[in-house]
Amino acid sequence: MEQSNGYETLAGKRLLVLGGTHASLDTVKTAISMGIHVTVTDDAPVSKRVAKQIAHSVAEVSTNDIDGLVDLIKKEKIDGVFCGPSEFNIQNTIRVCKAAGLPCYTTEEIWNRCADKTSLKQYCRKHGVSTSEEYPVSVFLTEGADEDVKYPVAIKPADGCSSKGITVCYDRASVLSAVEKAEKVSASGRVFIERYVDNGGRIFNIRYLINDGEICPYLAIDTFISDPINKERLISAFSRYPSDLYGQYMATADADVRKMLRDMGMKNGTVFIQTLPLDGKFYCMDMGYRLSGGLFYKLTEPLMGINDMKMMIRYALGGVMCTPDEIERIGRAKDLYFAQLTTPIEAGEIAEIRGITALKQDPTVIDVLQYYREGDCVSQSVIGTLGQHFSRVSIISEDKDELYRSVRRAIDTISVIDTEGNEMYLQRFDLGRIGV
């Protein structure tokens, strides 16, 4: 007999969600579906915030006004605080939970260890986790001092996210201008430079659930970036499950990664590790001690009955991270195939959107998350970041061939037209990259 997951005890609980943008929309939808009363707050009006438009109640307290949030928690008799994958609001969640005495899956100290790319490199080296060479900015300040640098190199904000401020450079001159760009994006003004692992644009993503210190790998997905040739748009274009690299990763890298996560102090929550597979090694590129923007629980729920979004909400409201039954389900995954298509569009004002209604009628399409609407403007400043994505289409099937037929239909069907009549969805994923 299947054990209770504890979700039924959450009905009527009151959850405060920080941030009303698309980043928290799925959090609000999920919490409402669990019977939870949801209040959404930030400093913008309801008309400007999609998540506020579906919440039970709203407030206009800024998400970094900790004192104001504590007062709101007392006034509304809030039982827990959470947010979506926004790293800015996760930090605010950590602080307000501490101030209000509410549960939080991590502390500010542990969060900072995980979010800082320089810190991550140090932990990788300490535990034998493969990682590419790192170079100090000083190496590029003097002509000739970079003779030992293995180009291309990637310049990143040390504390960045969402692919913002990242540039791939092939010479010293371009590095210097890229450093300025990354410094502007970094909250701390710090920049991180490493050898770019050029493997054709494939990322191996491994996800772990952490329950009272027990670290359990539960999902491995391949992601392919949008622009592997020019390397100007290092954002996701396509993801698939299962990954044919899972067995190799488990045999060669998993044990060291688990030791690293344990040493970082993680006790509960969900974490994803992004690696670049090349020549039998998995080079750790980034990690997130949080839910991901990919919303992969839309796969894991039908696959194995696990939903890390619901788990994190349950924990925020005083419940357990994982039940024993949920841990056991990891080994009972069904034979399913999954794909997620992300659709980067060009800058401009959207006049017309085509194909989304037809796409939603496809029985293999389990979710279409649309970030822009007709009349919205896509700024040039978001090109090359996750803000360039128009939509995220999740597809699932028991048949691999059927899955890829549906993916191809989605690629061919979606159309976004600007006010001058031009197609904005130009960089469509080439399934030939994965042999389909």
Labelled PLM ranges:
Residues 14-16, 153, 215:
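Conserved hydrophobic helix-helix packing surfaces used for dimerization/oligomerization
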Residues 198-203, 207-266, 270, 277, ...:
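ATP-dependent carboxylate/phosphate-activation module, predominantly the ATP-grasp catalytic core
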Residues 321-364:
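A glycine-rich beta-turn/hairpin centered on an aromatic-Pro dipeptide
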